[in-house]
């Protein structure tokens, strides 16, 4: 069963999706990570919510530059309060 998105999650993922469809194709492939930063942002927002997801996405985007080696960098799993 699919989890429903909050209106803020929907808005954030729609903006990122718009970037993927309209802006990213004109710039060409530049991201050195897998998944790409925009896919990472959508996944982080869906998994962790808007605030924490945007925090993870912002940290990831700051690492996406020519001096960073890149590579595999999946979204961290959601930790529950009982996990330490």
Swiss-Prot record:
<dbReference type="GO" id="GO:0005886">
    <property type="term" value="C:plasma membrane"/>
</dbReference>
<dbReference type="InterPro" id="IPR002696">
    <property type="entry name" value="Membr_insert_effic_factor_YidD"/>
</dbReference>
<keyword id="KW-0997">Cell inner membrane</keyword>
<comment type="similarity">
    <text>Belongs to the UPF0161 family.</text>
</comment>
<comment type="function">
    <text>Could be involved in insertion of integral membrane proteins into the membrane.</text>
</comment>
<dbReference type="Pfam" id="PF01809">
    <property type="entry name" value="YidD"/>
</dbReference>
<protein>
    <recommendedName>
        <fullName>Putative membrane protein insertion efficiency factor</fullName>
    </recommendedName>
</protein>
<keyword id="KW-1003">Cell membrane</keyword>
<keyword id="KW-0472">Membrane</keyword>
């Amino acid at each position: 069963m699919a989890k429903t998105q909050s209106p803020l999650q929907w808005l954030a993922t729609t903006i990122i999706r718009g970037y993927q469809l309209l802006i990213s194709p004109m710039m060409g492939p530049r991201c050195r990570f897998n998944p790409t930063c925009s896919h990472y942002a959508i996944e982080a927002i869906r998994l962790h919510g808007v605030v924490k997801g945007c925090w993870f996405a912002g940290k990831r985007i700051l690492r996406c530059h020519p001096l960073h080696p890149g590579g595999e960098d999946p979204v961290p799993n959601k930790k529950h309060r009982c996990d330490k």
